[in-house]
Amino acid sequence: MRTVSKWVLAMGAAAAMIASVSPSQAQQTIRVGWTIPAEESKYWMMRRPSEFSDLGKTYNVEWTQFQGTAPMTQALAAGALDCATQAPLSLANGVVGGNLKAYIVAQHVFEKPGGFSVYWAVKDDSPIKTIADLKGKTVGISVIGGGTQGPFNMLLKQAGLDPAKDIKLVEVGFAVSEDALRQGRVDAVNMNQPFAARAEAKGGTRKLFSLSEAMPNIVHILEACRADFVDKNPDLVKAYVRDITSGMKKALANREETLKVVSEVLKAPIPVLDTYLLKDNDFGRDPGAAPNFPAIQKMLDIYAQTGMLPKLDVAQFKHPTIVAPLQ
């Protein structure tokens, strides 16, 4: 009952938070949640809408930014969003705790061998040398209950720590994670691009552990839409998924323009982005934004094995026809 009550309160808050952006023409408008970083296809749609044949013509998007995937899950469950960026864990928590029914229609990024893996950093002079040394410390995470917390909890447990009792976990957005660490507000904090590259260039921090140590080939973020919205508006959602597909292709085909687009959205200098974006040391991206359902199933299975979720079948998230790539 405690979980359900928390979800009811959260869904009410999510609905109230973005009630002001309710669409005037629901049949032609999709309310979409987004976050940073690593949603290049959506950033292209936001910043270069004229590049898309349907966007702004046959349908519109009302964009709402969130700090992470968990609040967007709550907004989807509350009916306050139609589609949004999700992580496998946050989406699954919405199904279990919020009675959310949704389809995975596209995928944004995943961790590839040799590429970037989200990691936790400490100061160079910190006495923290191992995960076990985090006991009693204040640790920052982008969003509590978000996609990174699953493998994070697994790594803590493997080191003999209880994630609920042995550390103080606080929310620190990726954009301010470096400042929080350098100012001593946290003892360790998670790092994502481009903020990791910026911190590494300045020096004075070091990597403690990365998520790939717990779960290789993580599917970090995907695009999900409420099932009832998809079922009622199949042509509208198809147009949206076609543009997600097109956006991914544009992002990969024109790196120079993608650097400009991402810089505009993230407010990050192009020279910083140029050190990693769409290079071998970045996340992986499917060229057609196709969801890797087998990889997502493996993640759900691991979460079930560790007691974080009940057993779930990824098939419930797959629409028979509305899924990237769509032409």
Predicted regions and their residues:
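Bacterial N-terminal signal peptides that target proteins for export
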Residues: M1-M11
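Pocket-lining segment of extracytoplasmic ligand-binding domains
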Residues: L89, G98, A175-E264
